[in-house]
Amino acid sequence: ILGSLLTGARDAAGAYYRSRPLLISLGLPLADALGSPLGRAGGFSDGRDIGVVCNLPNREGPVVLPMSGDVGSQYTPAAGWAQAITYHRDTLQDPRYAGCIAVAHGGDGSVATNGFWAALTMATTLRLPMLFYIEDNQLGISVPGSMQTPGADIAKNLDAFTNLAI
């Protein structure tokens, strides 16, 4: 669903290892999505995928920014893309950036990382066109939500941020 809503010519997503459905919806060939993590030669990783670590350049629509295996590493590149959208839209007056957005897609365990907090601070302070899409299954890798977030409620802990809609 998320991928179908990224319709801007300069939209981008910073993704993580569970983002395979998002990548497929944005144009990753199904053969690559299934074959690369199985060590299949050819495709975007030539068999060296460690679990959806790729990028998906697209000159005509939304892109997936280069991914890393580090937890939380998707947030700051997405914030940088959002900052670039603002620059191109407002300073350069480039109409291709009107209505565009950067999405950071992550799991609940990644909100405990420096990258998340840095990107959140940038996005709210600079009022960047950015969406944080967090999948919260109350289990960050193997740590229960109650042990990684005070009160075990990520959204409630973000209430104090201005310029942030939850």
Which sequence ranges carry the predicted segments?
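Cofactor-binding active-site loop characterized by glycine-rich and histidine/acidic residues
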Residues: 1-126, 144-165
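Short, proline-centered helix/strand-breaking motifs
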Residues: 129-130
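Segments that shape or occlude catalytic/ligand-binding pockets
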Residues: 134
